[in-house]
């Protein structure tokens, strides 16, 4: 890939709590990103990845469609401050390894914080922003981006923890356009080699949830 996008909330969760594998983060990444699959250190650290190693033609591409609505009613949640919340030490270590590995294979690492009143704070934003600036990595915090047009009365399925299908479509459209413009990524929707993506998209959009 030309660009590898990492959602940032995982940086504040303990790596060791997930199966107690020191290579958990990179193991999981290798299940999804081809260039990471042959790194010798990651081969036998993670025992079971059944939930992630399904067939490549899986329609949802990792996202479970949910159109249910449970509004978030807590009001503004991104209050500017100088506070910092420390990243998990192991997660931060592997974040740097991912950056270096991406660069060594001609890919750029991009950090993105998804909209989530229940999970995200300005303290987390500050810590990720500090790391991104120190390591020359692009960072986009969607919690501070009004252009998304997220409506917390209708775009969340569980009171501001996760976006529902409508909210996810807004984020996908914005991030797709942003990455295309910022990195010159080509639109492959009319490329016959990627026809199955459009077919899967139609089937996925019409599926019940």
Give the positions of each predicted feature.
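Secreted/periplasmic serine-hydrolase-like ester/acetyl group-modifying domain
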Residues: 5-10, 14-106, 190-209
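C-terminal regions of proteins
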Residues: 126-203, 208
């Amino acid at each position: 890939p030309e660009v590898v996008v990492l959602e940032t909330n995982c940086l504040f969760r303990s790596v060791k709590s997930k199966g107690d594998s020191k290579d958990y983060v990179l193991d999981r990444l290798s299940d999804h990103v081809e260039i990471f699959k042959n790194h010798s250190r990651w081969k036998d650290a993670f025992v079971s990845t059944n939930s992630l190693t399904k067939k490549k033609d899986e329609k949802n591409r990792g996202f479970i469609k949910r159109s249910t609505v449970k509004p978030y009613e807590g009001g503004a949640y991104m209050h500017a401050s100088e506070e910092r919340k420390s990243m998990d030490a192991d997660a931060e270590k592997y974040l740097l390894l991912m950056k270096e590995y991406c660069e060594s294979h001609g890919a750029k690492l991009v950090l993105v914080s998804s909209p989530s009143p229940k999970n995200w704070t300005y303290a987390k934003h500050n810590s990720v922003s500090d790391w991104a600036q120190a390591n020359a990595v692009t960072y986009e915090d969607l919690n501070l981006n009004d252009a998304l047009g997220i409506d917390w009365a209708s775009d969340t399925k569980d009171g501001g923890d996760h976006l529902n299908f409508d909210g996810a479509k807004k984020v996908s459209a914005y991030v797709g356009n942003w990455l295309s413009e910022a990195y010159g990524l080509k639109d492959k929707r009319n490329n016959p080699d990627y026809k199955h993506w459009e077919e899967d998209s139609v089937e996925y959009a019409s599926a019940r949830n």
